[in-house]
Amino acid sequence: MSADLQETPKAGDASLERLEQSVLGFRRLSNQLLAVIVTIGGLGFTLTCLSSYLGRDLLPIGSPSSLLFVPQGLVMGLYGIAGLLLASYLWAMININLGAGSNNFDKASGMVKICRRGYFKLISAEFPLKDVKAVKVEVRDGFNPLRRLSLRVQGRRDITLTRVGQPLPLAQLEQDGAELARFLDVNLEGL
């Protein structure tokens, strides 16, 4: 999976009874770096607008006070507001850790539970293990690559198990898919 696999064997039994997989959400280093860069850019444009309006240099580099406020300063202010709004959205998504969750497969209870954190609530799907027909691996290369691991469930659409974002390495995707298919005792499709 895209995150740590924690397998919990049942006490007194050599076989695995439970498989838990945590899924990484929006709180990734790449998203945090992007939010920092957008915040700095938005503040820079906003301070340039204010410097142009007040006639004083508020930034240590350049001389934004020499810009005319009406055409250039005003446009810089609009860019600054747009940048700060985008940065606020990114920081809010990082704060709530959108998309984080877990995949729980429990042979003892015969249930699969998939949980993800949504915008305003926890999204959860539960279904019987016997309804799982296969583990599906999807690989598409090109401009917008796709490497996804999903469950094929009877009477439902395919349920994605991997995180959204940067594609997983192919070897890790194959290994995780084979491990899950072996645990669930179902076929591995798509390879």
UniProtKB/Swiss-Prot annotation:
This protein's UniProt keywords: Membrane, Photosynthesis, Thylakoid, Transmembrane, Transmembrane helix
Function: Seems to be required for the assembly of the photosystem I complex.
Membrane topology: Multi-pass membrane protein
Family: Belongs to the Ycf4 family.
One GO CC term on file: plasma membrane-derived thylakoid membrane
One of the Pfam families matching this protein, by short name: Ycf4
Keyword Membrane appears in the UniProt entry: yes
Top-rank lineage group of the source organism: Bacteria
The keyword Zinc-finger is assigned to this record: no
Protein name as catalogued: Photosystem I assembly protein Ycf4
Species of the source: Prochlorococcus marinus (strain MIT 9303)
HAMAP family: Ycf4 (MF_00437)
InterPro entries linked: PSI_Ycf4_assembly
Subcellular localization: Cellular thylakoid membrane
Transmembrane annotation, as ranges: 33-53, 74-94
GO biological process: photosynthesis
